[in-house]
Amino acid sequence: MELLCHEVDPVRRAVRDRNLLRDDRVLQNLLTIEERYLPQCSYFKCVQKDIQPYMRRMVATWMLEVCEEQKCEEEVFPLAMNYLDRFLAGVPTPKSHLQLLGAVCMFLASKLKETSPLTAEKLCIYTDNSIKPQELLEWELVVLGKLKWNLAAVTPHDFIEHILRKLPQQREKLSLIRKHAQTFIALCATDFKFAMYPPSMIATGSVGAAICGLQQDEEVSSLTCDALTELLAKITNTDVDCLKACQEQIEAVLLNSLQQYRQDQRDGSKSEDELDQASTPTDVRDIDL
């Protein structure tokens, strides 16, 4: 007799409020306040002496993997990276505390966006218990103080629905465009070059890159890529040339990510072949632990 219950309760979500999406004042208010929540400087040059850009990329990749494995809301990861960048822009931080800071930022973002937020204990497990729950809770107060409790930051996800509503797209294609745009937004959050970009530009560039990419495989828009870029720039009051440059950078980040993934796959296959040929290492000192 099987007593284990395999039923999974579906996530209950509120319907999108059409009154908010149809009111242009909401979009204008987002555009007005978005820059309040950007990092104040490129902190690698003037604030951080111990942390390098590649370290941020590593902790960002780890944070993204945690959010994906825990099936967090799409907004959690970009919001956590916003907290991390704003903190690092004002507080010199030793590299030994970077993962702790990343865990705290996920902890705060999930509290704001999740119905069942990540727990301190679970986040500590993801650090291989290199930090303790009490340490995470103490740093939570430190980060909150440095951010002045301004946690409701505007992120690219806040613009997605407003942008999609104004595009002449087939309704059945919107979910696919939305999914691709969300992927681009997550990729942008892992790359520091986008940290100083307004969220509206990242959102607009991500939607444009998603539609133009899908356009190569199937008809998802009646507009050409150039006409689409001009329309997107008009929606968010963005300079067309700046938007084109942003979209090209997003596409370059995607290409680099795909190439890295393929390289990792090849390296993995090569390692498996080598293990098959020699089941024991020829020199124990060559093993990097």
Swiss-Prot record:
Region (Disordered): 264-289
InterPro entries xrefs: Cyclin (IPR039361), Cyclin-like_dom (IPR013763), Cyclin-like_sf (IPR036915), Cyclin_C-dom (IPR004367), Cyclin_N (IPR006671), Cyclins_cyclin-box (IPR048258)
Pfam family, one: Cyclin_C
GO molecular function per UniProt: cyclin-dependent protein serine/threonine kinase activator activity; cyclin-dependent protein serine/threonine kinase regulator activity; protein kinase binding; protein serine/threonine kinase activator activity
Function: Regulatory component of the cyclin D2-CDK4 (DC) complex that phosphorylates and inhibits members of the retinoblastoma (RB) protein family including RB1 and regulates the cell-cycle during G(1)/S transition. Phosphorylation of RB1 allows dissociation of the transcription factor E2F from the RB/E2F complex and the subsequent transcription of E2F target genes which are responsible for the progression through the G(1) phase. Hypophosphorylates RB1 in early G(1) phase. Cyclin D-CDK4 complexes are major integrators of various mitogenenic and antimitogenic signals.
One GO cellular component term noted in the UniProt record for this chain: nucleoplasm
Related illness: Megalencephaly-polymicrogyria-polydactyly-hydrocephalus syndrome 3: A syndrome characterized by megalencephaly, ventriculomegaly that may lead to hydrocephalus, and polymicrogyria; polydactyly may also be seen. There is considerable phenotypic similarity between this disorder and the megalencephaly-capillary malformation syndrome.
Alphabetized UniProt keyword annotations: Cell cycle, Cell division, Cyclin, Cytoplasm, Disease variant, Membrane, Nucleus, Phosphoprotein, Ubl conjugation
Nucleus as UniProt keyword: yes
Domain Cyclin N-terminal: 26-151
Main location (coarse class): nucleus
Subcellular location as annotated: Nucleus; Cytoplasm; Nucleus membrane
Quaternary structure and interacting proteins, as annotated: Interacts with either CDK4 or CDK6 protein kinase to form a serine/threonine kinase holoenzyme complex. The cyclin subunit imparts substrate specificity to the complex.
Post-translational modification Phosphoserine, affected residues: S271
Post-translational modifications reported in the UniProt record: Phosphorylation at Thr-280 by MAP kinases is required for ubiquitination and degradation by the DCX(AMBRA1) complex. Ubiquitinated by the DCX(AMBRA1) complex during the transition from G1 to S cell phase, leading to its degradation: ubiquitination is dependent on Thr-280 phosphorylation. The DCX(AMBRA1) complex represents the major regulator of CCND2 stability during the G1/S transition. Polyubiquitinated by the SCF(FBXL2) complex, leading to proteasomal degradation.
Family: Belongs to the cyclin family. Cyclin D subfamily.
GO biological process, one term: positive regulation of cell population proliferation
Keyword Isomerase set for record: no
Protein name: G1/S-specific cyclin-D2
Superkingdom of the organism of origin: Eukaryota
Chain positions found as Phosphothreonine: T280
